[in-house]
Every structure is written in structure tokens, then in C-alpha cells.
């Protein structure tokens, strides 16, 4: 493939709260272990929208212009001299977190916890919502012909579901509660079923999102209104016939985490995926006296190979998650759509010559 000419790298850049712009960035120079990618499909994540609206997520503050995007797939156009496993023309999915050093967390395989990690579209690191993007070749995964670019981009949220189910030790025959029917809740549902969960119930405020959960495999759905966490937990137990061994909380809402504690079977596990306020009130004694283990999830690690295999074997289907598509030139409109909650997953197509999935 011919190298891109200078000035062709259209990128979506956040400058601060409420300020995103399409700008031309330089084509990045490769290091010896890097690849240059022609981006194809990039999904909009809630964190992208949050950086646009607020200019920060917790301690991560946008202090200089930053390219957004971290759910991505593209085509290799150039490789660094040390790269042996990829070549120009290869289609790849991008794992956005790359350790900058081999620290204690990397040595035990939990590189997602390394404090100095590079992570796409987390200040100060640029993301990949652009025409051309440089990434570490070791964190680019070749896609089989049977897996589309959009499926490759969806490996990022799918990885959150895989990692959450691993942290919860979801296994054959388990009953599972998923709190939240957004993109992360939906992929968690898909993974839990693929890992052998016998019954999965999904709860959410939105009837339309619960309908999507039912469409893709939820055994039961419960629409939450003004019930107390105790009452919701009783409904969960009623539809399942017993309390779930594993609850995976994907909203971050205080009441939802409380529901997770009340709903989970004694000796079971509550996995907290959703990021809410730093301080929340929890019925901790209720968890302690019933030995409900509470585990956190921060991004993911060691999930891309499994995700590629699951998609290639058609073990699960993530295609229904994509509800809207926009060309890169209309990325601001795409973000408006995502902000309004009009779709489940909004996908941006970065290659002007290929708008296919």
C-alpha cells in the first residue's frame, strides 16, 4: 500500500468541555516496533462523550488537544523494522492499552493496572478516531477474513465483558444478573451465555434497551422504575427461581450497586464494572455476613485472542450492537447522536473509500 501524503490525516480532536473539532494532524512517524494503520471503523464509547462534555474523567483531565477514539480496527499500511508478525494489507483490531514499561503488574499478567500505561484517548494520549494512526504492533491482532472491521472494533467493549465474566468466574450452569443494558451490559450478557450461564437476567431503566437485550439472548429482563434495591433484588430472585451466583454491575449507579449486593447469592460474587461517583453508600455488612465477594474491573487484559476466536467461530454475535453509522467527516453529528442516547453503538467509518461494515 502506498504511504499517505502529508496532510491527509483528518482527526476528531477534543480541546476542552463542549469543544470537539475535525482537524488535520501529521501522519505519525513509526518506531521500530510500531505499525501505521489506515483506520476503518471506530466506535464511540461513553468515555469519549464524557471527555467531550466535561473535559475530564476523574483525575484524567484534557489539558491539551486530544484525538478521541479507542474502539477501533484498521488496515496495516507500513511496519517498523522490528515487526515480523504483521505486514501491509493485514486487517487488525487494536488493543488500546500498551504498557510503557515492564513493571510488577506486567510480570503477573495484569498489565491493565500499570500506572504508566499508554491508553488511547486517555489524557494525555491521543486516540485513533482519525484516518491514520500509529500503534504498537504487539497490541494489534490480525482479523480472520470472516470477522468484519466493525466486529474488530467491537472487540474493545467485548473485552470488558470477557474480563468481567472472568473476574466473576462465570461458569457452566451459573445464574447471572447483569445490571444495565447499554453496550457493556449487552456484551456482558453475550459473554456470560457463551461461557455457559444457564440463565441471565438483565435490568435497566430503558424499555428499548431491554428489548435489545432480549433480542440478543437475555432469558429475562426487568424494567426498573422507582423500586427500592431490596424490591428489585426480590424480582430478580423471583424470575430466576433463586439468587444469581454472579452479578455484574455495568452502570455505576449507587442504587444499582446496592441492588447487586442484595440480589447476589450467599457465597457469590458481585463484579463492579460501571464507574460512578467516588463515594457511595453500600450495605457492606449485608455482603460481609453472606460472604458476597465484591470485585472491581478496570478495563481488561489478555482478552483480545479469546475475543477474536469467539467472533471467528460465531460463538457470539456483536453485530446487532451497531445501530448508527457516520463517515468521519460527520463525526461531530455522530457524537451528538451518541450523546442523546439515540443508539446503542454509534460507529464512525474512517476510510472514505470503504464504508462497509
From Swiss-Prot:
InterPro entries reported in the protein's UniProt record: ADH-like_C, ADH-like_N, ADH_Zn_CS, GroES-like_sf, NAD(P)-bd_dom_sf, PKS_ER, SDH-like
Binding site for substrate: 51, 156, 299-300
Gene Ontology MF annotations: D-sorbitol dehydrogenase (acceptor) activity; D-xylulose reductase activity; identical protein binding; L-iditol 2-dehydrogenase (NAD+) activity; NAD binding; zinc ion binding
The entry's keywords: Acetylation, Cell projection, Cilium, Flagellum, Membrane, Metal-binding, Mitochondrion, NAD, Oxidoreductase, Phosphoprotein, Zinc
Membrane topology: Peripheral membrane protein
One GO CC term on file: extracellular exosome
Record field: catalytic activity: keto-D-fructose + NADH + H(+) = D-sorbitol + NAD(+); xylitol + NAD(+) = D-xylulose + NADH + H(+); L-iditol + NAD(+) = keto-L-sorbose + NADH + H(+)
Binding locations of NAD(+): 184, 204, 209, 273-275, 297-299
Binding site for Zn(2+): 45, 70-71, 156
Co-factor remark: Binds 1 zinc ion per subunit.
Family designation: Belongs to the zinc-containing alcohol dehydrogenase family.
Annotated function: Polyol dehydrogenase that catalyzes the reversible NAD(+)-dependent oxidation of various sugar alcohols. Is active with D-sorbitol (D-glucitol) leading to the C2-oxidized product D-fructose. Is a key enzyme in the polyol pathway that interconverts glucose and fructose via sorbitol, which constitutes an important alternate route for glucose metabolism. May play a role in sperm motility by using sorbitol as an alternative energy source for sperm motility.
Protein name: Sorbitol dehydrogenase
Organism from which the protein derives: Rattus norvegicus
Gene name, Swiss-Prot/TrEMBL: Sord
Amino acid at each position: 500500500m502506498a504511504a499517505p501524503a502529508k496532510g491527509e490525516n483528518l482527526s476528531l480532536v477534543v480541546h476542552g468541555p463542549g469543544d470537539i473539532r475535525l482537524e488535520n494532524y501529521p501522519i505519525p512517524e513509526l518506531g521500530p516496533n510500531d505499525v501505521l494503520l489506515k483506520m476503518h471503523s471506530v466506535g464511540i464509547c461513553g468515555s469519549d462523550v464524557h471527555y467531550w462534555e466535561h473535559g475530564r474523567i476523574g483525575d484524567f483531565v484534557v489539558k491539551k488537544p486530544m484525538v478521541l477514539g479507542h474502539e477501533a480496527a484498521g488496515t496495516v499500511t507500513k511496519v517498523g523494522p522490528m515487526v515480523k508478525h504483521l505486514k501491509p494489507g493485514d486487517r487488525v483490531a487494536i488493543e488500546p492499552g500498551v504498557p510503557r514499561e515492564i513493571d510488577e503488574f506486567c510480570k503477573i499478567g495484569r498489565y491493565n493496572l500499570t500506572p504508566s500505561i499508554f491508553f488511547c484517548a486517555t489524557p494525555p494520549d491521543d486516540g485513533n478516531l482519525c484516518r491514520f494512526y500509529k500503534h504498537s504492533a504487539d497490541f494489534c491482532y490480525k482479523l480472520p477474513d470472516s470477522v468484519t472491521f466493525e466486529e474488530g472494533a467491537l472487540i474493545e467493549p467485548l473485552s470488558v465483558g470477557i474480563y468481567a465474566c472472568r473476574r466473576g468466574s462465570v461458569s457452566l450452569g451459573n445464574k447471572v444478573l447483569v445490571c444495565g443494558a447499554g453496550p457493556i451490559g449487552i456484551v456482558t450478557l453475550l459473554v456470560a451465555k457463551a461461557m455457559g450461564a444457564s440463565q441471565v437476567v438483565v435490568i435497566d431503566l430503558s424499555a428499548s434497551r431491554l428489548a435489545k437485550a432480549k433480542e440478543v439472548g437475555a432469558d429475562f429482563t426487568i424494567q426498573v422504575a422507582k423500586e427500592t434495591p431490596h424490591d428489585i433484588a426480590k424480582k430478580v430472585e423471583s424470575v430466576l427461581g433463586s439468587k444469581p451466583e454472579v452479578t455484574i454491575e455495568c452502570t455505576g449507579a449507587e442504587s444499582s450497586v446496592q441492588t447487586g449486593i442484595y440480589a447476589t447469592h450467599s457465597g457469590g460474587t458481585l463484579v463492579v464494572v460501571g464507574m460512578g461517583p467516588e463515594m457511595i453508600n453500600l450495605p457492606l455488612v449485608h455482603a460481609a455476613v453472606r460472604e458476597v465477594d465484591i470485585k472491581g474491573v478496570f478495563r481488561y487484559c489478555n482478552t483480545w485472542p479469546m475475543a477474536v476466536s469467539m467472533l471467528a467461530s460465531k460463538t457470539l454475535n456483536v453485530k446487532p450492537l451497531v445501530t448508527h453509522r457516520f463517515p468521519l467527516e460527520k463525526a461531530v453529528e455522530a457524537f451528538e447522536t451518541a450523546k442523546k442516547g439515540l443508539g446503542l453503538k454509534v460507529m464512525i467509518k474512517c476510510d472514505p473509500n470503504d464504508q462497509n461494515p
